[in-house]
A protein has these predicted regions:
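Flexible loop/hinge segments at secondary-structure junctions
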Residues: 1-230
Length: 230
């Protein structure tokens, strides 16, 4: 059994695994990234989502940025035509299959991996460093991202440039109407998220989510004041 984070992958190799081009754990491409690690001569079984999901969008967006073959043959989306593997419904379905199948590999939110005591790989990021998924590497991705109000702060954070950034970090977005039919409802919603941003860090971290950087929160609240009805 190899400990969590002991195996290293880069984006191209990860993409080749999900393309079905790298099919064993001791393939030369994986061995080259893991000198000194005894890798098993066992088949890799890819597990992906069977349902459409933001998790799949984020994962396939990342692969499209780092693996040209993936970009040209599969691309990105909440649901894609997977070249190989089996599908599981939801994060829980993917986690269950990966746990059951020897040599399985999939993608889930970190909270599911931790709750299910699953191993995970280290990944080579855009800065060329191998990093593991954690609050610190997620925060590094968020802190290095180029947020901006011109696109309502919409940003896909995959392959972020930060020195210690986890390369497959995702953001959750809240959508509200700029001209709501129920202004009181919008006001209550914004008050809730003001509380989340100012008081909710501990709850977010307990669920393995990372709070937004303070500077970004200030920008968002200024944007609310300028853009949304009071």
């Amino acid at each position: 059994c190899i400990a969590a984070g002991a195996v290293k992958l880069d984006g191209k190799t990860l993409g080749d695994i999900f393309l079905g081009k790298v099919t064993t754990w001791n393939d030369a491409a994986i061995v080259a990234l893991n000198p000194g690690v005894k890798l098993p001569d066992s088949k890799i079984t890819v597990v992906h989502r069977s349902d459409g999901s933001g998790t799949s969008f984020n994962f396939t967006n990342y692969l499209s940025k780092v693996n040209p073959d993936w970009k040209s043959k599969v691309g990105e989306g909440t649901a894609v035509q997977w070249p190989t593997g089996i599908g599981g419904k939801g994060n829980e379905g993917v986690a269950a299959y990966v746990k059951q199948i020897k040599g399985g590999i999939g993608y889930v939110e970190l909270s599911y991996a931790l709750q299910n005591k699953m191993a995970y790989t280290a990944m080579k990021n855009a800065a060329g460093k191998f990093v593991q998924p954690s609050d610190e590497t997620f925060a590094a991705a968020a802190n290095s991202a180029d947020w901006g109000s011109s696109k309502d702060f919409y940003l896909v954070m995959t392959n972020a440039a930060g020195d210690n950034a986890w390369p497959i970090t995702a953001t959750n977005f809240i959508l509200v109407q700029k001209k709501p039919k129920n202004p009181a409802g919008l006001k209550n919603t914004l008050e809730f998220f003001r509380w989340v941003y100012s008081k909710g860090d501990a709850q977010a971290k307990a669920l393995d989510y990372v709070p937004l950087p303070d500077t970004l929160v200030s920008q968002i609240e200024a944007y609310w004041a300028k853009t949304l009805p009071r």
